[in-house]
């Protein structure tokens, strides 16, 4: 919650705009409903939805319990479904909108020990294409960004025993471009997909 409030403060300073910050668990339907309702109350509607909830979860099948599978699917797949269910009616009222689902490259090309994330994200990619086909008539575009290696606090936590830059260098050696991506590069792509310049991109 501290990071959320800091992000709200930073955005207000940078944009001088109205920013609403709320703590919500997308695994809980009631939290999703409250988030949608308060957003509509504050801004008068919804025309952009970015489903970005997730956490690092990757291991082999034998180490995964039913509960671990369900938890990952509930967060990454059902969370997106709940938020889309709540936001789409408001987008229709506004004459259209844009939804971006954050998935991962493992959802298209999984490596070993990538479960359950690779399955949850593959389902997210399928959800994206299904909704894109269904909602196109309402001028609602739906896209997915299959994220690769991006600098984040998750990697910072993993580097406690060593240098963060050394970890990024090691990870970057596995990437064709030779480096780990910046969060701003991911954000720029999402902003493009949500903008008028991405108006002919869906699915």
Task: Give residue ranges: language-model regions.
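Substrate-binding pocket helix/loop in short-chain dehydrogenase/reductase
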Residues: 60-73, 167, 171
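C-terminal substrate-recognition "lid" of short-chain dehydrogenase/reductases
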Residues: 179-203
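The beta1-alpha1 cofactor-binding region of Rossmann-like NAD(H)/NADP(H)-dependent oxidoreductases
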Residues: 1-2, 23-34, 66, 184-185
């Amino acid at each position: 919650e501290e990071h959320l409030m800091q992000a709200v403060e930073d955005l207000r300073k940078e944009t001088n705009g109205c920013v609403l910050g709320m703590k919500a668990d997308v695994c809980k339907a009631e939290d999703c409903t409250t988030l949608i309702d308060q957003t509509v109350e504050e801004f008068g509607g919804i025309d952009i939805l970015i489903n970005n909830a997730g956490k690092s979860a990757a291991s082999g099948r034998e180490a995964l319990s039913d509960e671990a599978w369900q938890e990952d699917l509930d967060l990454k797949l059902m969370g997106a479904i709940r938020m889309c269910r709540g936001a789409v009616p408001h987008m229709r009222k506004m004459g259209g909108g844009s939804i971006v689902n954050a998935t991962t490259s493992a959802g298209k090309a999984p490596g070993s020990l990538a479960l359950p994330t690779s399955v949850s994200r593959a389902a997210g990619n399928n959800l994206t294409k299904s909704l894109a086909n269904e909602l196109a008539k309402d001028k609602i575009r739906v896209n997915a960004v299959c994220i690769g290696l991006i600098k984040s606090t998750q990697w910072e936590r993993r580097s406690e025993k060593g240098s963060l830059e050394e970890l990024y260098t090691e990870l970057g050696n596995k990437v064709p471009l030779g480096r780990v991506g910046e969060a701003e590069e991911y954000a720029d792509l999402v902003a493009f997909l949500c903008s008028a310049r991405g108006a002919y991109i869906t699915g």
